[in-house]
From Swiss-Prot:
Catalyzes the prenylation of para-hydroxybenzoate (PHB) with an all-trans polyprenyl group. Mediates the second step in the final reaction sequence of ubiquinone-8 (UQ-8) biosynthesis, which is the condensation of the polyisoprenoid side chain with PHB, generating the first membrane-bound Q intermediate 3-octaprenyl-4-hydroxybenzoate. PROSITE patterns: UBIA. InterPro entries: HB_polyprenyltransferase-like, Prenyltransferase, UbiA_prenyltransferase, UbiA_prenylTrfase_CS, UbiA_sf. GO terms for biological process: ubiquinone biosynthetic process. It catalyses: all-trans-octaprenyl diphosphate + 4-hydroxybenzoate = 4-hydroxy-3-(all-trans-octaprenyl)benzoate + diphosphate. This is 4-hydroxybenzoate octaprenyltransferase. It comes from Actinobacillus pleuropneumoniae serotype 5b (strain L20). Pathway: Cofactor biosynthesis; ubiquinone biosynthesis. Its cofactor is Mg(2+). It is found in: Cell inner membrane. It is an enzyme of class 2 (transferase).
Length: 293
């Protein structure tokens, strides 16, 4: 029994579990949290019920962790071939495939309990979220557009938030949802640009490979479409003009990102990806200004 606990629950093992769930790299959680907060506050016309807010924040943390576990499980045979991912717990053997599968199921169970605390409408929508989380990691084997599926997975919290607050999915919900998809494809292409050389070598597909030398131009187009959808969203929602001012200021970050990725240097592309956290935060502030100003 002692050996069992030492093998599966030692301090080093807990650290490996935490790394597998990316607790040491919160950027993914933030990029999932921002659109969730957009939708919660937009649907409520202000502060959503505290219980709903807490459930969704916890749900973001849990589902982001689950997504990382299933992603690394799917990529366990190729992560070791990529410079950026070669030290991940499954790639190095610090976490076994059995441990990863058990952890994934436990995280889904926690998410299931959280969903039970919401209304039936939202509970039913949550099954789509789980399906997208499971499907996404395997898409890079079959299509150059896995980022689109990631955008759907990261954005599905938006209809869930509207469902939890209003039990309806109005036009505003879908404008935010599709804005988030275009934004996600843009920033995850920046992320994929970091690994492009490795991905080409091992045969992994991505939008960074698909877009090739047109990558920066297409990213700029995707960002422009994101902004157009967010402007339409604000107009339909009849937000205060301050929303559009803050949104415009946030949009200036896209210009900075284009400058960073211009030379396609790995480190600069990764900085551009990280910078999207501030854009997501800016949109959230814009919504608050639009509602309360």
């Amino acid at each position: 029994m002692t050996t069992f606990f030492q093998q599966h629950f030692s301090r080093n093992k807990w650290l490996a579990y935490a790394q597998l769930m990316r607790f040491d790299k919160p950027i993914g959680t933030l990029l999932l949290l921002h659109p969730t907060l957009w939708a919660l506050f937009a649907a409520a016309g202000g502060m959503p019920p505290l219980s709903v807010l807490v459930i969704f924040v916890l749900g973001v943390i849990v589902m982001r962790a689950a997504g990382c576990v299933i992603n690394d499980y799917a990529d366990r045979h190729i992560d070791g071939e990529v410079k950026r991912t070669s030290q991940r717990p499954l790639a190095t053997g610090r976490v076994t495939t059995t441990e990863a599968k058990i952890l994934f199921v436990l995280l889904l169970c926690i998410a299931f309990v959280l969903d039970l605390l919401l209304n039936r409408y939202t509970f039913l929508l949550s099954f789509v979220a789980v399906a997208l989380a499971i499907i996404y990691p395997f898409m890079k084997r079959f299509t150059h557009l896995p980022q689109v599926v990631l955008g759907m997975a990261f954005g599905w919290a938006i209809p869930m938030a509207y469902g939890a607050v209003s039990e309806s999915l109005p036009l505003e919900c879908w404008l935010l949802f599709f804005a988030n998809i275009f934004w996600t494809v843009a920033y995850d292409t920046q992320y994929a640009m970091v690994d492009r050389d490795d991905d080409l070598r091992i045969g992994v597909k991505s939008t960074a490979i698909l877009f090739a030398q047109y990558d920066n131009k297409i990213i700029a187009l995707l960002q422009f479409i994101t902004l157009v959808l967010l402007v339409i969203f604000g107009w339909i929602s009849q937000y205060h003009w301050g929303y559009f001012v803050v949104l415009g200021l946030s949009a200036s970050l896209f210009s900075h990102q284009c400058w960073l990725t211009k030379q396609r240097v790995r480190e600069q592309c990764f900085k551009a990806f990280l910078n999207n956290h501030y854009f997501g935060l800016g949109v959230f502030f814009a919504i608050l200004v639009g509602i309360y100003a």
